[in-house]
């Protein structure tokens, strides 16, 4: 999919660059593969904001995407490629030989009419899924599982991918887009290819209203708030915050290391921060 730029006939169209989605399916999604979504406005069960800058936006139906790909050795044909409002990647509707329909993440270079299959060892072809134990080293993959059978969790956003770079005692080594080198069990599944819609990050939405349609609210600076709302808030007139930049909860926000270590850190061979100064 290419980018589409617009002539500045209105202020909202000046600088507007969007993805050309003319080749995608224009109808509604498959009814049995969608469910309703209730808007939370970024609040949790106690009513507190746990995710800032969320709220409003157009109504959505959630498309149930198969991230597990555990239907082994049953070929499926791609019926159509669809837009999914819940993610940056496109999704593909596939029909298995036994008649079952499913949505999968659409990789780059997957077209309508192509055949995909999941199995213990399959062809290295976009859309095919297999565990790392049956995969040749050097393969570009996406939708990578962290735990066998849990479903893909890594490399699912538009244009992302990981590279299978080696094996080591029951583990597969993968290099992620961020530069991180990590291990996962060889029984973990991954899908061949890079995720579709690589130009997603090159879009320019042109006006605030388009982001509001997507459910994104304005970002307010801490120094513009009251003292109750943010450590940088308050003061007479404009202030610089009066302290080193912090988050609303008082943690350093300009590079201070604040993350706790966790058990799975031992599976990270090289951190994505390895090249940073002082790391």
UniProtKB/Swiss-Prot annotation:
Protein name according to UniProt: Large ribosomal subunit protein uL2
Assembly information from the UniProt record: Part of the 50S ribosomal subunit. Forms a bridge to the 30S subunit in the 70S ribosome.
Listed InterPro entries: NA-bd_OB-fold (IPR012340), Rib_uL2_dom2 (IPR014722), Ribosomal_uL2 (IPR002171), Ribosomal_uL2_bac/org-type (IPR005880), Ribosomal_uL2_C (IPR022669), Ribosomal_uL2_CS (IPR022671), Ribosomal_uL2_dom3 (IPR014726), Ribosomal_uL2_RNA-bd_dom (IPR022666)
The entry's keywords: Ribonucleoprotein, Ribosomal protein, RNA-binding, rRNA-binding
Organism in which the protein naturally occurs: Cereibacter sphaeroides (strain ATCC 17025 / ATH 2.4.3) (Rhodobacter sphaeroides)
GO cellular component, one term: large ribosomal subunit
Gene Ontology MF: a single term: transferase activity
Gene3D superfamilies (alphabetical): 2.30.30.30, Nucleic acid-binding proteins (2.40.50.140), Ribosomal protein L2, domain 3 (4.10.950.10)
């Amino acid at each position: 999919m290419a980018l589409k730029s617009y002539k500045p006939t209105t202020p909202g169209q000046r600088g507007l660059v969007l993805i050309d989605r003319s080749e995608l399916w224009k109808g509604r999604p498959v009814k049995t593969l969608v469910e309703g979504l209730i808007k939370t406005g970024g609040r949790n069960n106690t009513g507190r904001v746990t995710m800032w800058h969320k709220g409003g936006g157009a109504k959505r139906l959630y498309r149930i995407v198969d991230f597990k790909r555990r239907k082994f050795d049953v070929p499926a044909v791609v019926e159509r490629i669809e837009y999914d409002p819940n993610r940056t990647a496109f999704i593909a509707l596939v029909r298995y030989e036994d008649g079952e329909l499913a949505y999968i993440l659409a990789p780059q270079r997957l077209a309508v009419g192509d055949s995909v299959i999941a199995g213990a060892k399959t062809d290295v072809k976009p859309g095919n899924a297999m565990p790392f134990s049956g995969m040749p080293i050097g393969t570009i993959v996406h939708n990578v599982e962290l735990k066998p059978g849990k479903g893909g969790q890594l490399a699912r956003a538009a244009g992302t991918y990981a590279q299978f770079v080696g094996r080591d005692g029951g583990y597969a080594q993968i290099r992620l887009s961020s530069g991180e080198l990590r291990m996962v069990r060889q029984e973990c599944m991954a899908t061949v290819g890079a995720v579709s819609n690589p130009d997603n990050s090159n879009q320019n939405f042109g006006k605030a209203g388009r982001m509001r349609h997507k459910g994104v609210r304005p970002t307010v600076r801490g120094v513009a708030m009251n003292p109750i709302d943010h450590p940088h808030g308050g003061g007479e007139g404009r202030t610089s915050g009066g302290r080193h930049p912090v988050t609303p909860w008082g943690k350093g926000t300009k590079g201070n290391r604040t993350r706790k270590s966790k058990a799975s850190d031992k599976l990270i061979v090289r951190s994505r921060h390895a090249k940073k100064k002082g790391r």
